[in-house]
């Protein structure tokens, strides 16, 4: 079928009402009065109301020849330039309602051609084992979060773009829109390169942007000379030194006077304040097919790390670490990470960072997998699964079981199927023959209903957890099982299975967790709560502002302090881990995601404004959790 051009795509200027000529220009009004409710994550616990600036055009105003039935087309192709990396919503309005996806243009400030698969408006993906893999869909110059609403595209009325809580009145230019059955490719149509030798977005302008290696070295030198351990009252294990409970030589949990705490190996009360991904591991980005985007790549003769590794193509953070530390750059960067943690009041890492300077850590076990795996659910009833669970636990835990610095281990992260149980059952039935499929067919022989499909999936999940937990306990009886880090909002019956763990972990992307929901969670599980992930980001450096947006770095610090102190005042709280240590690459990780959420940016520098809030929160943490001090009450500005 021949592609249909929008040769007369007319957009109205927001402020003036003038008709655009060659380039159609809209302004997202940061003072928009229209407000809409959105979930903070994909389908999370709360709906929040935000100002929304939307621009919508009926099809007849765009092109009278455009059909209303788009179901026979495969791609919506637009040429667009956003002035910002802040995401916008691409919306299709039909007779049945509104369809949408989140659109993230890398960097901003350049023209791109975006070929958007129309299937992403019609149904939720089943590809991927965790939430991010299901939702995130990358293209060369942008990425999409396919989160819905979904529906048929047979009775299209209008097309719209909308931005939630615009920061600084950003603009959007559109010069071409068409439908196509062929993928014309998604590309940058402007001057290249767009990423400099330090991994920064060239068109972006912001305070502190690196202009030279000399500037960067001066910043590094200043940090190295000024970085000293903070005064948080921590003992060698990161517990509160002037507290005392029973010492067992390993971390454990205990409820004292109605409040839950970790207890460190020496018997000190402990709240786990950590960051995911701490260390020298790079935030690589895909180069293949995008070689012209980058002004330079790490040269082959860079000094090797202690591991023998050299930064590879796309690893701009590793390149900057090699510039900073020279030979052995990875171990030196990990040692610096521990120094930073001590200065900022962080007490939990993801792994052993330095043998010379130990710090507690929580590790993620590689989950036993037996193919096929559907949205994170393996063939749990097969003999192979039980054998794999045993061998996997043995290989990973044997060397850790006597390490007093190990807080505990997670056994999974954000499985994608909770809330989609009947759909998962359908995938198992339609897939290859497995023991799980055989048991499902036998179970449904007595009646095939959505409720029974859901019942089977929940029973299978409980079986999976019991097998995995038993294997882990067999090879490590000393450490805490921190459970699966659930994401979004699983059904109550899924969360209730948290009773099988020592600690219930949940990734909670909110401005602070809802007290009633946390209380409900504790009633379901009876376990202390460890927040596995949370964060706040800004759209100011060429990256998207993460799942939870705030206006700038100062507001990030305020948001951190508000979140941490509010949740610390809840009795079931035992810790919170930020995601993540390092900003994602400006041109995205492998699934496209390019969030600005790090404690550290690609040039290995931290924001002092952000850290002010972090340090202030950590100094008050014990007294807030003990109920001696009221939590911080100032909320951050979103825009």
Task: Report each predicted region and the residues it spans.
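Short carbohydrate-recognition loop motifs
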Residues: 36-58
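Extracellular ligand-binding interfaces
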Residues: 50-147, 152, 168-170
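Short beta-strand-plus-loop segments that form exposed binding edges in beta-rich domains
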Residues: 160-168
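Active-site-adjacent substrate/metal-binding segments within catalytic domains
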Residues: 205-362, 372-405, 452-459, 467
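Aromatic- and acidic-residue-enriched segments that line the glycan-binding/catalytic groove
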Residues: 275-291, 358-371, 401-404, 411-445, ...
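Extracellular glycoside hydrolase catalytic/binding regions
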Residues: 293, 297-300, 347, 442-562
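Substrate-binding cleft of secreted/luminal carbohydrate-active enzymes
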Residues: 406-408, 412-413, 534, 548-599, ...
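Aromatic-rich peripheral "rim/lid" segments of glycoside hydrolase catalytic domains that contact
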Residues: 425-437, 441, 579-639
């Amino acid at each position: 079928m021949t592609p249909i051009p929008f040769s007369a795509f007319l957009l109205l200027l927001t402020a003036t009402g003038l008709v655009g000529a060659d380039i159609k220009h809209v302004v997202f009004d940061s003072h928009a009065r229209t407000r809409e409710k959105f979930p903070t994550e994909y389908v999370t616990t709360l709906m929040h109301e935000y100002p929304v600036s939307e621009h919508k055009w009926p099809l007849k105003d765009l092109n009278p020849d455009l059909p209303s039935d788009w179901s026979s087309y495969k791609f919506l192709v637009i040429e667009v330039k956003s002035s910002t990396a802040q995401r916008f919503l691409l919306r299709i309005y039909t007779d049945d309602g509104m369809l949408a996806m989140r659109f993230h243009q890398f960097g901003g400030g350049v023209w791109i051609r975006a070929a958007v698969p129309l299937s992403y408006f019609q149904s939720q993906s089943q590809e991927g084992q965790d939430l991010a893999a299901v939702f995130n869909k990358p293209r060369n110059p942008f990425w999409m979060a396919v989160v819905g609403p979904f529906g048929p595209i047979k009775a299209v009325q209008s097309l719209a773009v909308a931005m939630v809580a615009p920061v600084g009145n950003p603009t959007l230019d559109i010069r071409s829109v068409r439908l196509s059955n062929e993928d014309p490719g998604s590309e940058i149509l402007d001057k290249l390169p767009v990423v400099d030798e330090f991994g920064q977005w060239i068109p972006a302008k912001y305070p502190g942007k690196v202009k030279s290696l000399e500037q960067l070295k001066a910043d590094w030198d200043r940090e190295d000379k000024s970085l000293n351990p903070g005064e948080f009252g921590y003992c060698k294990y990161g517990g509160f030194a002037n507290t005392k409970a029973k010492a067992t030589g390993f971390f454990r949990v205990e409820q004292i006077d109605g409040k839950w705490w970790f207890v460190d190996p020496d018997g000190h009360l402990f709240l786990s304040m950590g960051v995911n991904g701490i260390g020298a591991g790079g935030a690589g980005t895909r180069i293949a097919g995008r070689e012209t985007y980058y002004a330079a790549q790490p040269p082959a003769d860079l000094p090797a790390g202690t591991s023998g590794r050299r930064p590879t193509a796309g690893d701009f953070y590793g390149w900057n670490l090699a510039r900073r530390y020279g030979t052995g750059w990875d171990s030196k960067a990990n040692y610096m990470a521990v120094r930073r943690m001590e200065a900022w009041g962080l007490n939990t890492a993801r792994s052993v960072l330095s043998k010379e300077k130990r710090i507690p850590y929580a590790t993620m076990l590689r989950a036993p997998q037996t193919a096929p795996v559907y949205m994170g659910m393996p063939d749990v009833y097969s003999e192979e699964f039980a054998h794999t669970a045993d061998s996997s636990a043995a290989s990973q835990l044997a060397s850790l079981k006597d390490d007093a610095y190990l807080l505990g281990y997670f056994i999974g992260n954000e499985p994608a199927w909770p809330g989609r149980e009947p759909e998962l059952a359908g995938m198992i039935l339609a897939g290859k023959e497995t023991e799980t499929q055989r048991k499902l067919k036998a179970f449904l022989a007595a009646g095939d209903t959505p409720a029974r499909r859901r019942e089977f999936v929940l029973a299978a999940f409980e079986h999976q957890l019991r097998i995995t937990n038993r294997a882990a306990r067999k090879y490590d009886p000393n450490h805490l099982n921190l459970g699966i880090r659930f994401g979004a909002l699983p059904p109550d019956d899924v969360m209730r299975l948290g009773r099988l763990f020592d600690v219930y972990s949940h990734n909670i992307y909110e401005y602070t967790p809802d007290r009633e929901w946390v209380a409900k969670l504790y009633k379901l599980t009876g376990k202390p709560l460890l927040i596995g992930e949370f964060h706040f980001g800004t759209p100011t450096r060429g990256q998207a502002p993460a799942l939870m947006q705030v206006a700038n770095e100062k507001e990030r610090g305020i948001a951190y302090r508000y979140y941490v102190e509010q949740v610390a005042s809840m009795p079931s709280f035992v810790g919170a881990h930020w995601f993540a240590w390092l900003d994602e690459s400006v041109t995205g990780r492998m699934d496209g995601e390019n969030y600005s959420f790090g404690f550290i940016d690609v040039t290995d520098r931290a924001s002092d404004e952000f850290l002010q809030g972090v340090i202030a929160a950590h100094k008050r943490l014990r007294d807030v959790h003990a109920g001696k001090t009221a939590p911080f009450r100032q909320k951050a500005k979103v825009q």
